[in-house]
């Protein structure tokens, strides 16, 4: 059982009364030719790695290989503990976990590319925060991961998730869309609302360039993962409220791909423009003339 785009995905969900996560699981079992127990074990492992990557730096901060980040998640966690946080419990937790995951990645730790290493904090950041805030089970979070993977699959099939091809809008943008869609389903929303949230996310991040300082997946990547969970939360809230999304996900994904291909090479992961070529960034990485 396969689907080529969101329109087909939605049609199958409606005809068979399936959630996006249930349909994606069926696809995994048929197209991937894996037995249910093996598939479940693999998803258990994915969730285990996500939890470790999102929590370890909070308790044991480690400097990144490039030296540009390290300890940020703990600082935000400590600030949250003072009761002076601005974002509310859910978003504060999501930001902490997202930034911690990027610290794990940048210090050669094990992460789950979701869909890429540079955007690996967004999906686990928001889903783990939801789990703690709403007392969700691991099985429910795995359901969210199947939903998120459906959005990622469509993006990889019909566009790109690579910053080198489509800019940060394709990398952090798609990860944020995955998280938003999963959040909507976990909060009781429909497949239509999940896709609306994913479309809203991409609209909000359209045109974002990929400009890693020193060519490293550290800065501004970590901060953009934090922005990604905020974007996903906002988009999910909008969709769950019943606000209409004018542009379908398939069309929004095509727009992301078109804009990405029009970005100059300097703004697609080459570190030759944007944040990467500011004087302070050059001084920090000791790489620019």
Feature-to-residue mapping (PLM):
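Generic N-terminal targeting/processing segments that precede catalytic cores or assembly contacts
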Residues: 1-109, 133, 242, 249-289
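Glycine- and small hydrophobic-enriched segments that form the cores of compact globular domains
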Residues: 86, 113-120, 132, 136-137, ...
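Acidic-glycine-rich active-site phosphate/pyrophosphate-binding loop
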Residues: 88-105, 140-159, 203-212
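Active-site-adjacent structural elements in folded domains
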Residues: 108-111, 161-167, 219
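Conserved phosphate/anionic-ligand binding catalytic regions in large, soluble enzymes, centered on
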Residues: 108-126, 170-175
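Alpha-helical support elements that line or immediately flank enzyme active sites
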Residues: 124-135, 180-188
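Glycine- and acidic-residue-rich phosphate-binding/metal-coordinating active-site segment common to enzymes
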Residues: 145, 151-164, 168-178, 183, ...
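Functionally critical mobile loop/hinge segments
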Residues: 183-289
């Amino acid at each position: 059982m396969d689907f080529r785009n969101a329109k087909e995905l939605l049609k199958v969900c409606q005809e068979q009364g399936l959630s996006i996560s249930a349909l994606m699981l069926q696809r995994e079992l048929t197209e991937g030719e894996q037995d249910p127990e093996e598939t479940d074990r693999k998803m258990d492992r994915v969730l285990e790695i996500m939890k470790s990557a999102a929590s370890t730096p909070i308790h044991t901060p480690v400097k990144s290989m490039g030296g540009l980040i390290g300890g940020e998640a703990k600082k935000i966690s400590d600030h949250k503990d003072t009761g002076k946080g601005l974002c509310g419990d859910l978003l504060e937790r999501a930001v902490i976990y997202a930034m911690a995951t990027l610290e794990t990645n940048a210090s050669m730790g094990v992460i789950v590319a979701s869909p890429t290493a540079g955007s690996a904090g967004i999906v686990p950041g928001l889903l783990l925060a939801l789990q703690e805030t709403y007392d969700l089970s691991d099985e429910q979070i795995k359901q969210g991961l199947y939903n998120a993977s459906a959005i990622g699959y469509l993006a990889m099939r019909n566009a790109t998730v690579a910053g080198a091809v489509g800019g940060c809008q394709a990398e952090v943008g798609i990860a944020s869309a995955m998280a938003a869609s999963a959040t909507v389903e976990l909060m009781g929303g429909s497949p239509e609302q999940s896709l609306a949230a994913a479309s809203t996310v991409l609209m909000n991040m359209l045109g974002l360039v990929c400009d890693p300082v020193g060519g490293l997946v550290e800065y501004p990547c970590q901060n953009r993962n934090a922005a990604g969970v905020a974007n996903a939360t906002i988009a999910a809230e909008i969709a769950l409220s019943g606000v209409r999304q004018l542009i379908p996900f398939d069309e929004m994904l095509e727009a992301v791909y078109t804009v990405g291909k029009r970005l100059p090479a300097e703004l697609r992961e080459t570190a030759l423009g944007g944040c990467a070529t500011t004087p302070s960034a050059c001084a920090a990485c000791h790489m620019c003339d």
